[in-house]
Amino acid sequence: MSIKLTEQEQIRLSKLDTYKKLNINPFEKIEKNLNYVYSKDLKEKYSSYSKEELESMDLYFDLYGRITSQRGPFIVIKDYFDKIQLYFNKKEHLDLAELVSNLDLGDIIHAHGKLSKTNTGELVVKIKTLKLLTKVLKPLPDKFHGLSDIEEIYRHRYLDLISNEHSMEVFKKRSKIISLIRKYFDSNMYLEVETPFLSNYISGAAAKPFKTFHNALSQEFTLRIATEIPLKKLLIGGIDRVYEMGRIFRNEGIDTTHNPEFTTIEFYEAYSNLEKMMQRTEELFKLIAKELNLKTLQNKGEEINLEEPFKRVDMIDEVSKATGVDFRNVTLEKALELAKEHGVKLKKYYTVGHIANELFEKLIEKTLVQPTFVMGHPIEISPLTYEASDPRYVERAELFINGKEYANMYTELSSPIEQLKRFEDQLNEKAQGNDESSDIDWDFIEALKYGMPPAGGCGIGIDRLVMLFTEKESIRDVLFFPTLKNKKSQG
């Protein structure tokens, strides 16, 4: 099947014949590694000099970049950091005239020339030699508007990055945030580790897994839904402070805060507890804000203050206030009645604890604008967590900001006997239709029998964290390549 080319594509393709006649390779390789410079370095170092001073200094530089505009003898190229103007004097370099006349927006070039300034005081490199490195055969998106179709932005992120400087800045900030997170944990004597993506057991979170099959072993595996269990095994092994940052996979819905594969950090610290995990989490968020020079954030018209101490509330107290019913003493019958009143979809295995959590998600989550730790979760929804003084609840907290959950932390359950009982309770829920319940992880139970020190642990969603600090509303805006439905299968 022949591909229909646009007029622009036909023109660009025809130029390949011209390059052949000129003995120019339109898809060149780098023969010699040069000490090239970035435009921002030139601007930082030489912007304060006058044109006359620069001319007398006789400075020559090599630059690489993509052509973003071409006007008369001036060519503007963009590198990773910034743009700079090149000047081509046709009279002095007739040998380059045909090459320059056949350049197009988007072409990637190598220029060598003398640094100077224009009459308006802008830095410019006067071209001495010029080389085409990569010919662009398709026209780039309009430089002023970029890609307008949001689906096309996600499907062709490379074009978005070329044409939209703001998108590029978002992903640079993402990289900086990840570096800051590593710096924080490394400086606090945590050891970064890597654990398997393929798992024998579904455990560590309430989520549906992706399944795969290993041919050589004739065995079914799941892609990990959390890193909690292997990291706790490393606590047992004697690594007192451990963290992992990596991809997690959950076979669930896609929306503005969920993507089937996403990045988290989980960290565990021996001889600590929930209080320490809340302290570490608050420190981390405030460190990132400080390093990014952010005191407040704007989100949907709300100003979020990251400098004040994070609030703390109790889940059951908040549900009791919202419903007008004391949920510490409510009967299951009354809880079911309230759930129906508030449009909660009931499931067979639901207890008062499950219903309290559902009502919290429905009535209260969206109201938590300022950073807030929600504590005191029901034991039914926290199978890996140490119980509180009231055994119906556990030592757990979730951090909410602007109505979204950003972190989940708790004092870790260390008893193999109690952990087995919790896993068995999860199996009972699974039998009643809870397809997000954990299996019994016998290997983990065996590991716990060798003794896990008292510990605190926490998981933070990196993508949501980046959304927060870049003030983005959709997780797709902070993922280079979000999961999308195949075009061919779209109806």
From Swiss-Prot:
GO cellular component: cytosol
InterPro entries (alphabetical): Aa-tRNA-synt_II (IPR004364), aa-tRNA-synth_II (IPR006195), aa-tRNA-synth_II/BPL/LPL (IPR045864), Lys-tRNA-ligase_II (IPR002313), Lys-tRNA-ligase_II_N (IPR044136), Lys-tRNA-synth_II_C (IPR018149), NA-bd_OB-fold (IPR012340), NA-bd_OB_tRNA (IPR004365)
SUPFAM superfamilies: Class II aaRS and biotin synthetases, Nucleic acid-binding proteins
Primary enzyme class: ligase
Entry's localization field: Cytoplasm
Family indicated by similarity: Belongs to the class-II aminoacyl-tRNA synthetase family.
Protein name: Lysine--tRNA ligase
Gene, per the UniProt record: lysS
